[in-house]
């Protein structure tokens, strides 16, 4: 209550809780996601050796998986070489991990729309930490596979990071936040494998667990709630029922969970959202396939060792981080779609250079263009999609998008590996180059409404 000069007192307006500063939110999301990705990517350079050790131990579960891999390799005509076999085995495990993300991401997003981002994030990170604890505590293939299953189901924290950024008020903050998420991915996939390659294999699971627990404590202490109670979905049951629509790929592509929710985008905007989701799926389907077969190509054509492949992926990650820091995060709101179209067009010569080049300079030029596209497309598309839906739908919207990406990453490597070994590298990469015209053409039809996006 305040008193004026005449002695009269008037009640002051109630003090409202201030929304968390956007810069702080983005910084916490970046550091938390980086810790999570470092824990996840520590495993990558150890995976071939880990699988070989389970094979030498004559693990019965590993043997049954190996027979399935051998059957698939024979079906697509892949040479019976141990190195190729380990890449294919690891890729199939990665596809299972992505498939579990596809199933869990929309449910996590719907839960966060009702209960808030913090509870959903803490629950996901607790599951991730549990997965590393299972891996560290036991050395059997069954325990390793169980840790991957728990981790895949719990990996909704990544889609929640995008939902938290989508909660931010201004389009410029959302755009920069999505770019910062891209930087975290680039740094995580650059530093994590490098660190894992130099550590003793028995140390890596415990370090991954340390990173995961540190991430959980960091988020507990510093992440503010970005979805206030008055903007949340009214019922978690309704959210789960809507999210169940996303277990159907067709319903997923139609954003059915969003369309049936409260205050959904309608008309042209709903059509644009569906088009953007299709572009996201097609891009990651093609891109993840090229990414997976790249290990086959450089070993077959250039005889790259594991160390040389590590250097190659370090170059890709460092280039992506540089482009995201210097260019992608500076893209103005409304210009994201134009940047995505340019990046997708760059993938056409990139695919041809990689698929047809027989010299290291040509390969390097292709990888440079490939890295540019990888640095731009996902952050910009995520930023645009974040503008759709009411505040209480952001988790479902971004969970849907993440689920589309996980589905693409689950099937893309299998299809690309089949095409690579059945038709050859040149045909595989040429067909992929031509198919990149599909998402580009869809974006041309969506450009006008997409540029005028604003939070609903």
Curated annotation (Swiss-Prot):
Pfam families: MFS_1. Its main location: nucleus. It is a multi-pass membrane protein. Signal peptide: none annotated. SUPFAM superfamilies: MFS general substrate transporter. The chain crosses the membrane at residues 25-45, 87-107, 125-145, 149-169, 179-199, 204-224, 278-298, 311-328, 343-363, 365-385, 422-442. Keywords: Apoptosis, Cell membrane, Membrane, Nucleus, Transmembrane, Transmembrane helix, Transport. It is found in: Nucleus inner membrane; Cell membrane. One of its GO terms (molecular function) is transmembrane transporter activity. GO terms for biological process: apoptotic process. One of its GO terms (cellular component) is nuclear inner membrane. It comes from the Eukaryota. Probable organic anion transporter which may serve as a transporter for some non-steroidal anti-inflammatory drugs (NSAIDs) as well as other organic anions across the luminal membranes of renal proximal tubules at the final excretion step into the urine. Belongs to the major facilitator superfamily. This is Major facilitator superfamily domain-containing protein 10. It comes from Bos taurus (Bovine).
């Amino acid at each position: 209550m305040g008193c004026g000069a005449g002695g009269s007192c008037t009640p002051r307006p109630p003090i409202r809780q201030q929304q968390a500063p956007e810069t702080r939110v983005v910084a916490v999301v970046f550091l938390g996601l980086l810790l999570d990705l470092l824990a996840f990517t520590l495993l990558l350079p150890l995976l071939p050796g880990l699988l070989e050790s389970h094979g030498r131990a004559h693990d019965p579960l590993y043997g049954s998986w190996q027979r399935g891999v051998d059957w698939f390799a024979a079906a697509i005509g892949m040479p019976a070489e141990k190195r190729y076999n380990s890449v294919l085995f690891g890729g199939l495990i990665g596809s299972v991990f992505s498939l579990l993300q596809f199933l869990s991401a929309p449910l996590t997003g719907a839960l966060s729309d009702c209960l808030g981002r913090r509870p959903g994030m803490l629950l996901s990170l607790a599951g991730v930490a549990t997965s590393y604890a299972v891996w560290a505590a036991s050395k059997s293939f069954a325990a390793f596979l169980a840790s991957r299953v728990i981790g895949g189901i719990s990996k909704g924290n990544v889609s929640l990071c995008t939902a938290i950024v989508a909660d931010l008020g201004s389009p410029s903050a959302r755009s920069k936040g999505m770019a910062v998420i891209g930087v975290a991915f680039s740094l995580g996939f650059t530093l994590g494998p490098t660190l894992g390659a130099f550590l003793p294999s028995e140390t890596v699971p415990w370090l991954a667990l340390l990173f995961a627990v540190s991430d959980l404590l960091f988020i507990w202490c510093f992440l503010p709630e970005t979805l206030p109670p008055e903007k949340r979905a009214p019922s978690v049951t309704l959210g789960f029922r809507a999210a169940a629509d996303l277990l159907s790929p067709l319903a997923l592509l139609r954003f059915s969970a969003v369309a049936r929710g409260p205050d959904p985008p309608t008309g042209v905007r709903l059509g644009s959202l569906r088009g953007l989701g299709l572009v996201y799926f097609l891009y990651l389907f093609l891109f993840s396939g090229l990414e997976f077969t790249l290990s086959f190509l450089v070993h077959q054509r250039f005889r790259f060792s594991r160390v040389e492949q590590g250097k190659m992926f370090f170059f890709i990650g460092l280039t992506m981080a540089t482009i995201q820091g210097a260019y992608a995060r500076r893209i103005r709101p409304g210009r994201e779609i134009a940047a995505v179209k340019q990046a997708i067009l760059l993938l056409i010569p990139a695919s041809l250079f990689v698929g047809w080049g027989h010299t290291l300079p040509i390969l390097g030029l292709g990888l440079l263009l490939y890295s540019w596209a990888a640095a731009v497309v996902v952050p910009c598309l995520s930023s645009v999609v974040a503008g759709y839906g009411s505040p209480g739908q952001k988790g479902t919207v971004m969970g849907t998008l993440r689920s589309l990406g996980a589905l693409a990453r689950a099937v893309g490597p299998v299809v690309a590996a089949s095409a690579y070994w059945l038709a050859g590298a040149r045909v595989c990469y040429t067909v992929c180059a031509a198919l990149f015209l599909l998402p580009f053409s869809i974006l041309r039809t969506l450009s006008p409404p997409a540029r005028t996006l604003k939070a609903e």
